[in-house]
Amino acid sequence: MPKINQEELENILQTKINNLDLYLSAFTHRSYLNENRSFNLPHNERMEFLGDAVLELCATEYLYKNYSHPEGELTNFRSALVNYKMLSSIASRLGFEKFLLMSRGEAKDMGRARQVILANCIEAVIGAMYLDSGYQTCTNFIAREVLVELDNIIEDGKYIDPKSRLQELMQEKNGITPHYGVISETGPDHNKTFVLAAFVGEKEVGRGTGPSKQEAEISAAEDALKKNLF
């Protein structure tokens, strides 16, 4: 049975752990069980389901109590707080990767798949924390590690999705709406990679990659915003 350094994890989470197995399960990706049949704890997907609900409730409650914005903006704030990119960056900052249990194949993938695994992991850890210590402990952790990002999200306009931000900027500057085109599409049906470009008229202003056309468009819009070629 793999071991987790309880004292180290308690220091990271800033909470006392009563049942370490809950956290060991929270760090266990489904793929690990395929290579370790004797492992006698479940993978983290059910715990992730629970933690996702706790995280969303905590974020919603905080936004409702502290911000007077309309419902649509509060929803956008919350989405920016709990999307996989934000959660994976928080999990990386906390050093969760050292605790992850996954297959050798998954361990080699350092791209988007790893980001998703880390995002799911932090939700599972919140689920474990809820079962181990209750809602208030989760609230303290979420406020300290997740909600602290909110001011930057609002100040930088990160709650507005990149495609909407790019469109607003383009229409302000020259009244043109950007459009997107497929550059390439590779891979089998179950694991495709799309490369799309963002265009202003005939000029390419950004390019992005993703497992779906929608995500590649978002990536292209992000690239265009960074390059600011329009």
PLM regions: where:
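Double-stranded RNA-binding/processing signature
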Residues: 1-230
